[in-house]
Regions:
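Short, surface-exposed secondary-structure boundary micro-motifs
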Residues: 9, 30, 66-67
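Short aromatic-glycine-enriched beta-strand elements
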Residues: 19-27
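Short, structured beta-strand/loop micro-motifs enriched in basic residues and often containing a Trp
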Residues: 39-47
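C-terminal structural segments of small proteins and small subunits
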Residues: 62, 68-104
Length: 104
């Protein structure tokens, strides 16, 4: 699993039938800043994920990849490799609060 920030959406009018009705979002993975371990920073990479929790633009989310992405009831029969499974409220690392959704 990893943390990511929702950066956008993907619309595909031509796709396999099993993906019809599923929201696709772009996300940028986050990591602890190696120069300032009190904050999260983007990695510069982009992933497309199926959203199973109703996430929105700018939210910090929890992502699973690979076979784990197909273990939710919503995705078990989908050809996906990355799934949003949670919207993050807080992140604490080494006793420090790195993220709090209430203060963003």
């Amino acid at each position: 699993m990893f943390l990511a920030r929702v950066t956008g959406s993907v619309v595909a009018t031509q796709k396999v039938a099993s993906l019809t009705g599923h929201k696709l979002l772009t996300v940028e993975p986050l990591r602890v800043d190696p120069t300032d371990r009190a904050k999260l920073v983007g990695t510069g990479r982009t992933f497309v994920c199926v959203d199973t929790v109703g996430a929105g633009q700018g939210e910090t989310v929890l992502i699973v990849q690979g076979s784990s992405a197909r273990l939710t009831p919503e995705t078990e029969k989908l050809p996906v490799d990355a799934t949003i499974i949670g919207i993050i409220d807080t992140v604490t690392v080494e006793g420090r609060s790195l993220f709090d959704a209430r203060s963003t």
